[in-house]
């Protein structure tokens, strides 16, 4: 059972900032009118609401193979998958881990779990066995859906239960593999055989509350180690509706549109703003397992992609790679950039390459459900947005800016910490009431840890980050995680990790290390030590040796001093 303590039951931990007096609070809202959100519906029912009127329209496209599933076929597959999972003992409140790159099976499994009232926690298949196990254990996973090539990761970590298809128990693990072109690994179950044998009529009728969890992504929040973010049916439905519902949707797409899904679905931006928004709107989703420039350009051209969700490294590739000119990308009408800020130079370069497309940015974080603001130029009745703007706050939500030191509300054009309140924000962190109370205050405001301001036209601009997270190509790299690994090395006395600007990745993690007495440990040995324990984007790009880590009187690492050292190099 996933539980999150109610605010009144949570320990009295100080919020990220103190609240300003109510009469002094300046609240910013969307330029678009609020809408009726059917948040009483379970997520699968909400997303497939148009399936009956679009039965033969394309829904999911496996871009690499060309296999296309209509809305009718997709919904049927999801129900059969739900029946198969139910037969394996998955029920209301159970957690299912999806350890996959983007594929049709990922989407089907996510919706199948929703039909059963179960919860999906998606993990990055490129993570190390140790990292996967941490998420597995924290989530209380009952079953894993993966690909044969990743099964060895589950066998390599001794703390994983034994994989066994015949026995269900606390000391065994049920693993389903999606491959249909090779032998199923020993002890695993073949996904498509389970689907073929399933009866969609056997899916149980489950009483699902809007406050039941449906997704459990992991995020490092504003500080610290990765934590499970509890997103309910209400919060996810609300987050999708804020983007694509209403007479003038903020992100306008529908039948006939094709959304490119090349960003990983284990990232909330892709799951929410691409897959779920497209299905709800009646658009097709072209699923690509990974980013490869030639394959992506070919998919855009072949499937006539109209909506492309990207992150800054993809924008850089589209803007600068000469291969782009060999492909017809004229079908693209919307380019939505998220996950990390984007510079004006890149914006201008992309506009020169795709002059017919509307380009804009959104701003979000996993805990916020995830979108806080979106470019108003994407709306059905568009209004222009400034360069560098993250758009205006989403509908049915409130945004305020507070002084990070005093907590008092700030007016327009004054930078401070961005806070958001609305039905889309998380229920809380999994089994972590202290972190929840430190992020969501007693009035329901979620403190993002990002510094920004709202201008005279209600547009949101992000200018800095209070939180310590490093953003490598849009992926989160929590310094605390790397620091704990570094300090565990017997030849390292102390360590700190900070971001360094990078033209391609945005930011890369760099370590400052204090050697232990009599140690002569080298940079290469430290980098190798870390690379064996973390996913590729968390690997250290540089190690600097210093005599002491600068810290405050309370022992907090003075990261600004270390960043200044990097800038001076």
Curated annotation (Swiss-Prot):
Pfam entry (one): AMP-binding
UniProt-listed PROSITE patterns: AMP_BINDING
GO molecular function: (E)-caffeate-CoA ligase activity; 4-coumarate-CoA ligase activity; ATP binding; trans-cinnamate-CoA ligase activity; trans-feruloyl-CoA synthase activity
Catalytic activity reported: (E)-ferulate + ATP + CoA = (E)-feruloyl-CoA + AMP + diphosphate; (E)-4-coumarate + ATP + CoA = (E)-4-coumaroyl-CoA + AMP + diphosphate; (E)-caffeate + ATP + CoA = (E)-caffeoyl-CoA + AMP + diphosphate; (E)-cinnamate + ATP + CoA = (E)-cinnamoyl-CoA + AMP + diphosphate
Keyword Repeat: no
Region feature SBD2, mapped onto this chain: 362-429
Chain positions recorded as ATP binding sites: 219-223, 227, 361-362, 366, 450, 465, 556
Pathways involved: Phytoalexin biosynthesis; 3,4',5-trihydroxystilbene biosynthesis; 3,4',5-trihydroxystilbene from trans-4-coumarate: step 1/2
Gene3D superfamilies, A to Z: 3.30.300.30, N-terminal domain of ligase-like
Swiss-Prot/TrEMBL cofactor(s): Mg(2+)
Residues that, per the record, bind CoA: 290, 473-474
Residues annotated to bind (E)-4-coumaroyl-AMP: 269, 273, 339, 361-362, 366, 374, 467, 471
Alphabetical keyword list: ATP-binding, Ligase, Magnesium, Nucleotide-binding, Phenylpropanoid metabolism
Induction profile: Induced by UV irradiation. Down-regulated by wounding.
Expression sites (tissue/organ): Expressed in roots, stems, leaf blades, leaf sheaths and spikelets.
The EC number(s) this enzyme carries: 6.2.1.12, 6.2.1.34
Positions of region (SBD1): 292-361
One Gene Ontology term from the biological process aspect of the record: phenylpropanoid metabolic process
Entry similarity comment: Belongs to the ATP-dependent AMP-binding enzyme family.
Domain free text: Both substrate-binding domains (SBD1 and SBD2) are involved in the substrate recognition, and are sufficient to confer the substrate specificity.
Job of this protein: Involved in the phenylpropanoid metabolism by mediating the activation of a number of hydroxycinnamates for the biosynthesis of monolignols and other phenolic secondary metabolites. Catalyzes the formation of CoA esters of cinnamate, 4-coumarate, caffeate and ferulate. Is more efficient with substrates in the following order: ferulate > 4-coumarate > caffeate > cinnamate. Cannot convert sinapate to its corresponding CoA ester.
Name of the featured protein: 4-coumarate--CoA ligase 2
Species lineage: Eukaryota, Viridiplantae, Streptophyta, Embryophyta, Tracheophyta
